[in-house]
Amino acid sequence: MDEEMLIPEEEYQKSGVHIGTQVKSSDMKPYIFKIRNDGLYILDVKKTNSKLIVAGKMLARFEPQDILVVAQRQYAFRPVAKFAEVTGATAITGRFNPGTLTNPSLKFYKEVKVIIVTDPLADVQAMKEAVKIGIPIIALCDANNKTDFVDLIIPTNNKGRRSLAVIYWLLAREILKNRGTITSYDQFKYTIDDFEAQI
């Protein structure tokens, strides 16, 4: 039986969620739908959808303050900040200071139990520290990403403005639904535009 789509497949595609890169890592091979004539790898949005459902259930089990979401990429700053505001998670955008997760004597030290990284390549310092302290890592992974140490892969275009907004909007909505904060999607009062970076 086909899994329920959180938004229509066309919506994922319209937002560019499926647009990968021209380089593919062997780790991401299972999530590639096809390769376009121009050499661009296309991601399978059904798998994106499926992983978002799993991530929503998983994250709903954590206390909001125990969830950390990080992003180095500028287009992800607003989606990540909005996601944190809506779910009660903690967000770190921009530079990730070394020791944030590993050095309790630092004033910016954070004690968390799960981390969401926007791009394993850009957010490498956060990844290293999460591995060191042994917390689960959920990562938005594009066609070119290596997925070593990633516990839950969400295959997606992790560079596009609209795709990042859609992914964080859906993830926030899924968490609230699984927590019981909202009982139906109609009660989720935010739009994708609320999550999208401004130009």
Curated annotation (Swiss-Prot):
Q: Which family does it belong to?
A: Belongs to the universal ribosomal protein uS2 family.
Tell me what this protein is called. Answer: Small ribosomal subunit protein uS2
- Report one GO cellular component: small ribosomal subunit
Q: Which residues form a coiled coil?
A: none
**What keywords are assigned to this protein?**
Ribonucleoprotein, Ribosomal protein
SUPFAM superfamilies in the record? Ribosomal protein S2 (SSF52313)
Can you provide one Gene Ontology molecular function annotated for this UniProt record? Answer: structural constituent of ribosome
Superkingdom of origin organism: Archaea
Please name the CDD domains in this protein's record: RPS2 (cd01425)
**Keyword hit for Transcription:** no
Q: Which Pfam families match?
A: Ribosomal_S2 (PF00318)
Cross-referenced InterPro entries: Ribosomal_uS2, Ribosomal_uS2_arc, Ribosomal_uS2_euk/arc, Ribosomal_uS2_flav_dom_sf
Q: What biological-process GO terms show up in the record?
A: translation
